[in-house]
Amino acid sequence: MPYKISRAAYAGMFGPTTGDKVRLADTELFIEIEKDFTTYGEEVKFGGGKVIRDGMGQSQVTRADGAVDTVITNAVIVDHSGIYKADIGLKDGRIVAIGKAGNPDMQPGVNIIVGPGTEAIAAEGKIVTAGGMDSHIHFIAPQQIEEALMSGMTCMLGGGTGPAHGTLATTCTPGPWHLARMIEAADAFPMNLAFAGKGNASLPGALTEMVLAGATSLKLHEDWGTTPGAIDCCLSVADEYDVQVMIHTDTLNESGFVEDTIGAIKGRTIHAFHTEGAGGGHAPDIIKICGQPNVIPSSTNPTRPYTVNTIAEHLDMLMVCHHLSPSIPEDIAFAESRIRKETIAAEDILHDIGAFSIISSDSQAMGRVGEVAIRTWQTADKMKRQRGRLKEEKGDNDNFRVRRYIAKYTINPAIAHGLSREIGSVEVGKRADLVLWNPAFFGVKPDMVLLGGSIAAAPMGDPNASIPTPQPVHYRPMFASYGKSLTNSSVTFVSQASLDAGLKGRLGVAKELVAVKNTRGGISKASMIHNDLTPEIEVDPETYEVRANGELLACEPATVLPMAQRYFLF
């Protein structure tokens, strides 16, 4: 007769199972395990007296005959596709199986073979997510990359050359020479990286040479002049070479209004940065474009979520980031035109209903590179407290809301930028860029970050201690952050045209160069998983009130947030 144990005892030994609920950090978000792919009584667990031992849960199968390189045991997987429990098998830096691990000679239903050559990562009671993607990076300081990695990001896309004033304001790596230097620099960092060229030009020649030099995308920024002519030219080049276009529109409405920008886009796919407008864009109604079926709208994290401090901090940020002077009245007026509490409040709600598709950082240029996940979950928590359960929820949990919000910094930016065949979800065949979390620290401080199946970062105690846990415990680079393991564990994304033109041989870089694919007509707002709503947006030009399909979008600023000072005492 089978042995029975209580749910609490089972969760303590093997982690939660079907029907169990888990609180995410100190939020009001609760997930429920939808399905458990492990087998009761046949679970694999590593340790003294446990299951993964020779002749028990560990088989005699060689790597060549199918044993995996690494098994992650009893993980709660939180993904856009669902919330479930399973073992995860990794091989050659990719996810090769999700399901039941063990020894097929002794155990039934095994699809992940554990052999003598298999390493074990114990995920009992832990959450596993796909590594995050931050799609709005100003490459101002290389130290951003370590900060992002330690927060659970494994891919960064953007532009820049360092603390040049063009980079301080705009996410562009301008020209083939600068792109070459940045792609060369990418070899030094444990992070998947992708670079955007400058998209502001009225003739295609200079844009084409940037795509051929490795740009994965082109960025239109108002500080370089986002005119209708530049928009049309940039999108035409992008359509020819299959790269994405990101746009920061004309705050001052000098070369046209939001309707003129929509007209210049001509129904072509485009990623609209900080679509609410505090980060820049047609004042006061750039937010209207989130209702366009060809526009993929995103937020940057300083306005996530709307709090009592949001408005006050933005003016100074704007003055610094956009090279403005407090002694010039026009510069002050420019800055003030972008900060509107009504549109920021509406942004919260538009995220919650799935009309805004992506959250990113805007690193060091009105954005905090280490807080993409934190700000995403703070927004989700604020919306649950203020708006209650989503109508799509089934059962007494927040599973759908959690799936909607995690998609905003994993699968959706990957789809938008042509990377989703490689990254963005916990899925067989994709890169094993994975993050382990203690549920109490979910979204705030990872337990472990894997790049290409190797451990790149983790909190670690005193290296001279007799065990790994004594203080001081802080985040440290792990072995995938060093030597050839670094360049073999992460990649640099480039355009297909640049690969065809011999970019890798020309630069002699060590990292694999991987082409982006399907960034143009094959995707649209409808491709944004759980975040594809296209409401008709109206903005009152006098009061700045925002309506979606006639409904006023208004909410109060938060006075207290989860995932904040409780986690950062020092």
Curated annotation (Swiss-Prot):
* Catalytic reactions of this protein: urea + 2 H2O + H(+) = hydrogencarbonate + 2 NH4(+)
**Could you say which residues bind Ni(2+) 1 here?**
H136, H138, K219, D362
Question: Which residues carry the post-translational modification N6-carboxylysine, per the record?
Answer: K219
InterPro entries, per the entry: Amidohydro-rel, Metal-dep_hydrolase_composite, Metal_Hydrolase, Urease_alpha_N_dom, Urease_alpha_subunit, Urease_AS, Urease_asu, Urease_asu_c
Q: Supply the EC number(s).
A: 3.5.1.5
Which residues are listed for substrate binding in this entry? Answer: H221
Q: Name the GO terms of the biological process aspect.
A: urea catabolic process
* Domain Urease, residue spans: 131-570
Localization of this protein: Cytoplasm
Write down the required cofactor(s). Ni cation
The residues listed in the UniProt record as binding Ni(2+) 2, with positions renumbered to this chain, are K219, H248, H274
Q: From the UniProt record, give the pathway where this protein acts.
A: Nitrogen metabolism; urea degradation; CO(2) and NH(3) from urea (urease route): step 1/1
Keywords in UniProt for this one?
A: Cytoplasm, Hydrolase, Metal-binding, Nickel
- According to its UniProt record, this protein's enzyme class is hydrolase
Where along the chain is the active site annotated? H322 (proton donor)
Q: How is the cofactor bound?
A: Binds 2 nickel ions per subunit.
PROSITE patterns for the chain: UREASE_1, UREASE_2, UREASE_3
Q: What does the annotation say about its assembly with partners?
A: Heterotrimer of UreA (gamma), UreB (beta) and UreC (alpha) subunits. Three heterotrimers associate to form the active enzyme.
Q: Which family does it belong to?
A: Belongs to the metallo-dependent hydrolases superfamily. Urease alpha subunit family.
Its recorded name reads: Urease subunit alpha
